[in-house]
């Protein structure tokens, strides 16, 4: 499925590119915005899971906390996915980080959510995740790093432990692993997703979706996977 919704990617020079398939795109926006030919295969790694861990279908999201189109997916798409598939036990969402270099605080925001998780569990991770997207300014421009320990405090976490974790860069390599795995399957911007049948070894082979797609695009693929196709 090619990109039917906007997403942010890196150009060859490392600058931001907003890709959109409709109209007359600029030369920069004509850089590849779709998916590799054929299915892709990627691990869920040890990343946080939202929903039933034994769900038959896995949705892996590669996302950036400062990406405006990731925020759009958070506000528009995620509630529909939760209502129809995640909360009903049919789909589990695995969140993997893909912080783009031109978003100044995205890397540390990704590490911060992992620091929150390390004190508790996946549920706490997604509470932290939700707060970053909810509190980010219109357009998803992210938060000041000083706001991250405030979120941690509001979630009942040990703030000193959280700040030490964040300052140490404990999860820098974890975030880099997510980036490397995404890049290996052709992810070049956010949000990007892989939908496939769940597997015992955590290797998900499935469809790569790029951009802030509507719920209908996900529904069509998820229903196919649920029907064993």
Where are the regions that the model predicts?
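Generic, ordered loop/turn and secondary-structure boundary motif
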Residues: 49-51, 99-101, 210
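Structural alpha/beta surface segment adjacent to cysteine/selenocysteine redox centers
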Residues: 55, 60-153, 185-188
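C-terminal cap of thioredoxin/glutaredoxin-like
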Residues: 1-30, 62, 76, 149-229
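A generic local structural motif
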Residues: 44-47, 78-80, 179-180
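A short beta-strand-turn-helix
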Residues: 40-57
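Short coil-to-helix leader/linker segments, especially the first N-terminal amphipathic alpha-helix
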Residues: 28-43
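Conserved short-loop catalytic and cofactor-binding motifs
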Residues: 47, 100, 136, 163, ...
């Amino acid at each position: 499925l090619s990109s039917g919704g906007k997403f942010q990617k890196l150009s060859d020079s490392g600058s931001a590119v907003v890709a959109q398939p409709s109209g007359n795109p600029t030369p920069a926006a004509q850089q590849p915005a779709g998916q590799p030919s054929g299915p892709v295969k990627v691990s869920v790694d040890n990343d946080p899971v939202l929903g039933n861990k034994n769900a038959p279908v896995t949705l892996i999201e590669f996302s950036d906390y400062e990406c405006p189109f990731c925020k759009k997916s958070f506000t528009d798409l995620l509630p529909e996915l939760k209502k129809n598939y995640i909360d009903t036990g049919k789909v589990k969402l695995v969140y993997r980080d893909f912080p783009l270099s031109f978003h100044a605080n995205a890397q540390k925001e990704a590490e911060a959510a992992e620091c929150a998780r390390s004190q508790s569990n996946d549920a706490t991770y997604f509470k932290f995740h939700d707060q970053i997207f909810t509190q980010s300014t219109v357009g998803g421009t992210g938060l000041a790093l000083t706001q991250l320990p405030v979120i941690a405090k509001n979630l009942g976490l040990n703030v000193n432990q959280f700040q030490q974790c964040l300052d140490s860069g404990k999860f820098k390599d974890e975030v880099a692993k997510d980036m490397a795995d995404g890049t290996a399957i052709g992810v070049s911007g956010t949000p990007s997703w892989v939908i496939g049948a769940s597997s015992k070894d955590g290797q998900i082979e499935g469809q790569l979706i790029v951009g802030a797609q509507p719920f209908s695009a996900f529904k069509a693929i998820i229903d196919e996977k649920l029907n064993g196709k």
